[in-house]
Amino acid sequence: ADAKPYTYYLELAATAADEFMKSSGYALYTAETPATNYVNLFNKHSVVEGTNKEIILARNYDIQYGVVHSANASYQSATLGRPGLTRKLVASYLMKDGSRFTDKAGWQTMTFVEETKDRDPRLAQSIRTPGYCRLNTTTPVAPNLGYTVTGYAPIKYFTGVEDDTYQTSYNDLPLFRTAEVY
């Protein structure tokens, strides 16, 4: 076979990505603030309408047609899998200044509060960190270790309390975003 070197495919991918960024009409979502942009890509009932030009492909859910899921119920239950991010994944989030968290002295033994301090804002939009509030509320909610096997409770796809019952979540689930092209 005439196998091509990996650089050939990397160059093809770079060319396609450049063309996509210049001419697709898609763009990174910046409608709000750095403290909310990332999480709001995943917790809106419709992510493909309005000012959001980042989502390329999403699984559409619609309560009107009974097309629902149970993301909220799964995140609020000790019996529905207890999802949680791994410590290795959490450690991979950068610091707010762009430096690596794992370059900090003593990072392996830091408390949860210490390890989530001064991190890239997307960490606090991926897991419950100190000061986390549910969507459309102002009351801080601490992580419930009974709901997550790792201690790092995910909040992606997590909407308001009105969707907490089993099979009542209907926010769209992004599958492919412009950020993956960048």
Segment roles from a protein language model:
Residues F112, K117, T129, C133, ...:
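Conserved, well-structured interaction surfaces
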Residues A1-L145:
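An aromatic- and glycine-enriched ligand-binding surface/loop that stacks and positions planar moieties
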